[in-house]
């Protein structure tokens, strides 16, 4: 099967070829969407991920039929997107978003057993940096029940599109005297909520306190 084109056809001036820019996006958000065809039908699912060097790593239950299909060589498309702002133009037609959006095409492969624990630690630290040092190690049973997959981030199997400009209103709208601009967006974290079975005298771990400052 031939690989889909990675050339941006709609607004091609927004395509970015910088690998560093791709890595910055992948490292900034923990959620990806994975699409594949299984039993003749398209399926898609969200999943946490981490970039480990030049590979994109996901994990899940060994009982997942979709993950098993990926581990057996099903072609996949992975989408990662973050919203950075709302572009408020002088009309609904011209209003849009600031965003960074990447799509990767390829085939996942199983991470060998001797590298599985390290990849899972990378995934955990992606979500809460520093927490791996505060947690117990995964048990053999947990590792055996977990499927860890990786996809190579090559030189030609990804596409990155970035929109970061100002409203592009026609002159007659600019002259109408209506406000236009950008509302920046960012992710923030609230105060930690203690689990009902967690005694009050157990301190909040450093990794959680840093995340929520």
What is the predicted function of each stretch?
Residues 1-5, 115-213:
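C-terminal edge-of-domain segments
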Residues 48-50, 71, 142, 152:
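Well-ordered beta-strand positions
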Residues 55-57, 77, 159:
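General beta-strand recognition
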Residues 56-60, 149:
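A generic structural motif
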């Amino acid at each position: 099967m031939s690989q889909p084109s990675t050339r941006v056809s709609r607004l091609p001036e927004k395509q970015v070829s910088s690998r560093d820019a791709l890595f910055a996006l992948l490292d900034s958000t923990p959620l990806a969407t994975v699409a594949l065809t299984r039993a003749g039908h398209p399926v898609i699912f969200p999943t946490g991920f981490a970039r480990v060097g030049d590979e994109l790593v996901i994990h899940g239950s060994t009982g997942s039929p979709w993950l098993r299909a990926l581990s057996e060589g099903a072609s996949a498309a992975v989408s990662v997107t973050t919203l950075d702002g709302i572009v408020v133009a002088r009309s609904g037609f011209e209003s849009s978003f600031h965003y960074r959006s990447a799509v990767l095409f390829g085939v996942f492969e199983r991470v060998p057993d001797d590298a599985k624990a390290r990849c899972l630690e990378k995934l955990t630290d992606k979500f809460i940096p520093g927490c791996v040092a505060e947690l117990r190690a995964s048990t053999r049973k947990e590792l055996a029940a977990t499927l860890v997959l990786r996809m190579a981030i090559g030189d030609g199997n990804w596409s990155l599109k970035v929109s970061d400009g100002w409203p592009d209103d026609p002159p007659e709208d600019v002259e109408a005297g209506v406000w236009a601009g950008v509302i920046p967006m960012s992710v923030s974290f609230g105060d930690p909520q203690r689990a009902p079975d967690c005694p009050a005298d157990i301190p909040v771990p450093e990794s959680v306190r840093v995340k929520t400052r």
